Amino acid sequence: MNGKQLVAEALQAVLPDWSLDDIDVKIERPKDEKLGDYAFPTFTLAKTMRKAPNLIAAELAEKIDQGSFEKVEAVGPYINFFLDKSQTGAAILQEILADPENYGARDLGHGRNVLTEYSSPNIAKPMGMGHLRSTMIGEAIARILAKEGFKPIRIDYLGDWGTQFGKMMAAYKMWGNDADIEKDPINTLLSYYVRINREAEEHPEYDEDGREWFSKLEHGDEEAKRLWSWFREVSLERFKKVYDMLDVHFDSFTGEAFSAQMMDKPIQILREKGLLVKSQGAEIVDLEKYNLPPLMVIKSNGTSTYITRDLATAMYRKKTYGFYKSIYVVGQEQEVYFQQLRACLKEMGFDWADDIVHISFGLMSINGQKMSTRKGNVVNLEDVLNESVDLARKQISEKNVGLKNADEVAKQVGIGAVVFHDLKNYRRNPIDFNLEEVVKFEGETGPYVQYARARGESLLRKSGITDFSDADLTKIGAEEWDLVSFMARYADTIQKAMETYDPSAIAKYALELAKRFNKYYAHTRILVDDVDEDVKKARLAVVQAVSHVIKSALDLLDVKAPDEM
């Protein structure tokens, strides 16, 4: 039951020159729920109807068929619609209970491919907390797109190419110890990388060594290729362990090295179109007409830059997947770079360049401290996830001593807490991470939402009722309507999150639904003898529906929803 559609249809009956789509985009939700469930502003009608908006609203409100509504009234220039709580509420509940997994879904994508590139850690370095944002924002966006009928293709574009990788080889050649690497590959390789960057301040030749090793790799040197394969293998093995903890799974792990094999084609096109210009020994693309700085393609030493691989990658992906959109979930410090990428593709003659979408996000700090792999103050993501699970286990043991699957629930709550904290914040905002605050069962946290649902599931188990097909769902009252009408907003919330590429809309919705349910749980008598059986079953149906919607919302965020906590 789409209340917004009911309003649009009622309005079209008195505005025959307007299409349903034109009306739909004008319909609003009043900030004050006392003003109705939906509102329609009449300002845009003033010019054609040659009347004041207040008069138009009053006239139309009188003409509208109120059969599906409790009331329709004009308030100033707005027409406010109050849905029939009994009939509409029953229809909404029926829709949720009949197909909970698909509730809120809209087939807007029609199966079109959307490439989503996210996480993209550098090989031979551990996944730090800084990778959490890209990984979870990207995964949530992919899930939201799938909910809306698109086919997301998840790509982990590994950072396995570049001069920084040459530095890793140079460091290994100077200080490498195979036994240490076999024992703890990632942290050992990281220590080499940190050391060469630190010592390069006094030994500039170390930077040159790194560039030389990368040049060897580009030209197929066997030793360079051997080291590359080894570093990549041990890194990917470790990454997949973290991805399994997060329940993140990719369709492709092809990285920059794969793209490096295809660089000749974009460079050829750039040369043929006369787009490459010599500048201080390097070759650039002039993007002045886009109000963008020049884009370096070939360095003065003859090595390629990131852009050659990204151009090749974009061309390959369009040819291979025929994408509708190609999304890159990368920090906001890369905004200008992605503008340059799109502009360069346009100059090369690709009309799909505007289908390249950069989803930017703000930096994460830990207890107010910035992180830097180069300086060595990186916070290991796997360690944080394990610590969060331990904290969750401690809280669960205090709340529910006899919980049978406590370890599994602790994983779901602990990891979910970290993920939810990231996604509840608008992605472009910088965020600070404090683990003890994140895992609390109170406040705007993942465990708070999970616990609200678990309370509902406990109530349902105690009732012994699992089938609501014969429930009289018209028996809901004002308290239930507060929950039901809010659940009716779920589809709009998902669509908003999809259109803005902003998972925080889902997280905020889940928090608000949990808050409303906790209030309902505290003030409404359900499993008591003096409550009418039909009313009791209708109330339990509402609890079941809330449980379904919270679980669905958490799933879009890649957060588990345990039935018991």
Curated annotation (Swiss-Prot):
It comes from the Bacteria. It catalyses: tRNA(Arg) + L-arginine + ATP = L-arginyl-tRNA(Arg) + AMP + diphosphate. Its EC number is 6.1.1.19. SUPFAM superfamilies: Anticodon-binding domain of a subclass of class I aminoacyl-tRNA synthetases (SSF47323), Arginyl-tRNA synthetase (ArgRS), N-terminal 'additional' domain (SSF55190), Nucleotidylyl transferase (SSF52374). A motif ('HIGH' region) lies at residues 121-131. GO terms for molecular function: arginine-tRNA ligase activity; ATP binding. One of its GO terms (cellular component) is cytoplasm. It holds the Pfam family DALR_1. GO terms for biological process: arginyl-tRNA aminoacylation. Keywords: Aminoacyl-tRNA synthetase, ATP-binding, Cytoplasm, Ligase, Nucleotide-binding, Protein biosynthesis. It is found in: Cytoplasm. HAMAP family: Arg_tRNA_synth. Monomer. NCBIfam families: argS (TIGR00456). Belongs to the class-I aminoacyl-tRNA synthetase family. This is Arginine--tRNA ligase. It comes from Lactobacillus delbrueckii subsp. bulgaricus (strain ATCC 11842 / DSM 20081 / BCRC 10696 / JCM 1002 / NBRC 13953 / NCIMB 11778 / NCTC 12712 / WDCM 00102 / Lb 14). The gene is argS.
